[in-house]
Amino acid sequence: MRLRRTLLTLALAAAVFGAAASAQTPADRVDPFIGTTNFGTANPGAVTPHGMMSVVPFNVMGSEENVYDKDARWWSTPYEYHNKFFTGFAHGALSGVGCPELGALLTMATTGPLTVDYREYGTSYTAEKASPGYYSVFLDKYGVLAEATATARSSAERYTFPEGTGHILLNLGEGLTNESGAMVRRVSATEIEGTKLLGTFCYNAQKVFPVYFVLRVSKTPSAGGYWKKQRKMTGVEAEWTPDNGRYKLYTEYGRELSGDDVGYWFSFDGLAAGEQVEVRMGISYVSTENARKNLDAEQAADAPFDAIREQARKGWNEALGRIRVEGGAEQQQRVFYTALYHALLHPNLVSDVNGEYPLMERSGETGVTDGERYTVFSLWDTCRNLHQLLTLVYPDRQREMLRSMTGMYEEWGWLPKWELYGRETFTMEGDPAIPVIVDSWMKGLRDFDVAKAYEAMRKSATTPGAQNRMRPDIDPYIEKGYIPLGFYAKDLAGDTSVSHALEYYMADAALSLLADSLGQGDDARLFRARSLGYKRYYSPESGTLRPLHPDGTFLSPFDPKAGENFTAAPGFHEGSAWNYTFYVPHDVEGLAKLMGGRRKFIDKLQMVFDEGLYDPANEPDIAYAYLFSRFRGEEWRTQRETRRLLERYFTTAPDGIPGNDDTGTMSAWAVFTMLGLYPDCPGEPYYTLTSPTFDRAEIDTERGTLVIEKHGEGYIDRMTLGDKPLKNYRILHDDLLKGGKLTFELQTGK
């Protein structure tokens, strides 16, 4: 647990660590404040592994003291480490995303005269603490200690008040989401229920969905009621309306209330100093009835707050404890377990305790599963490493995610791309469900409907563009082998044709592997041939991949550095040609031949790192450091660059993630790299090896415990798998698990 703004002397820190190190659990090594600035968009809120519910401090509105304000700029997280103004706890949030969504259902504790305007009731705060499944903060204006914990589908908050009158507020008008509209209904003096509309993620105005809630307070209030922001009127109407343009308190109204800016308040008179009021909330994306079922099933009426908190912590220790590391610096262990923590947040549950969930793209209709249904499939990001991590260490969860994806196809007709609570947002490009499913299949996860999955993949890889929701620009891709400039975006500054094509090449390479595994030889050859179309983009003149016009000529003039720092670059999405040129993980040797051979490939790739052209926060080049190891004698470069990247970009500071965590993708890179292996080609059942960070790691897998040991420091001299020497730096998943123990012998020289 971390106490922000508290200074410890080095001597005290050393003494405490020395005494407690042996007793530390994995959860003790997690710092939820890592990644909460530098646009990492992580947050320190309370959540369980893959939980539907998260309880997140909301500090991005209401005060000029804040460095960042959600209403003053594009902003995609409910919490920023450097902000100072707290306006409540949000219930349900996304971690590591680039567009604003969720972060609503804001609860707040206040004292003194009642006010429901967040600009007035917000407060500075101190003494933040966060650990897996728990968050607390002291609200300066009110002298209130606010604490939060969570179960999979519900939350618990505990507010410790000073003497006097206290209030609990539920603000349904504000939040991170850009959507508006809510309803709240009084059920009893201590319980309310309702719904809030969410959606419009990443410019998708029609992709909206409701969240339902039931909220209970532990103490009977002395008063309670609704509020609503009144519309601004002029003239005579304004003269007759005392609440014109302001928040109106409804003290004599007891039925439901709807509107864009509504809420509910509970007041408690005569509180003793130190008296506590607890708030419990259940949520559902199906119905209010299910929100109540979720709350009742996961929290007994008399369950103490501390028991719920301890259960959340236990769940995290069980999940994090599937990987146990020894050695390395204390800070490295903290980086590792925090990265693993972030990698276990999304995808998250969307099914309720009764198995019900919102059907994919069938608004208002409900499905039922006898397992678990998952949501938040940010697949352009997570197809590269996060699902591979789940396959290796958490296969049961990955199976449910595979079933969730194939279920979406059965309900909607397409696999997901960037799915969010039953809505497809089409964010980013490519056909990223294919490499995820293929990768799992090739690594032995086969108890899902692979025939249905293959049908879905083949559909998106062959359907003409006018009818193709996954690949609307597939026609020239099939006819020409590439996507020309101007086909997808007439404005060349917004054209991302090369990026689109590269994603399709990778997906088709993976699909060819599955086709071959299923005995579909003709399909295997077809999709493999398509995956090599990237060669048409290679320009000997620039030495990079380069956008093509419809007539097959290269874009000119052309600057391969254009696109750095998210500036526009024709053909490329959020990056430069250098961020994409080596993004052919399924044919690295073929790309090297195009470049003039191994030596030129290595020199050019090394130049990308040496001249700062590598973007550690961008997915297409995320595996670049591992490409050196495809060539014998160059493996030391992989070890050097991965070590440098870890040391520079992954730290224990609040900015200790290199930009947006992308629902755990950057964190999954760190987890794999610190263990000494990485899945450098999505869909292929291989890992590329590098020097591990830790002296020993034990990883629980379906086939037993995989042990990774490191002896010495520096560069790899020898490796053994089991009791046999290992010469190849690329190893099959099956061989790794069969071997059981991977040992690295390091020496100081290369």
Model regions and ranges:
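Accessory carbohydrate-recognition regions in carbohydrate-active enzymes
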Residues: Q24-C383, H387, T391-P435, W441-L502, ...
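Bacterial N-terminal signal peptides
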Residues: T9-G18
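Bacterial N-terminal signal peptides that target proteins for export
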Residues: M1-L10
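Sec/Tat signal peptide C-region and signal peptidase I cleavage site
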Residues: A19-A23
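ATP-dependent phospho-/nucleotidyl transfer catalytic cores
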Residues: A507
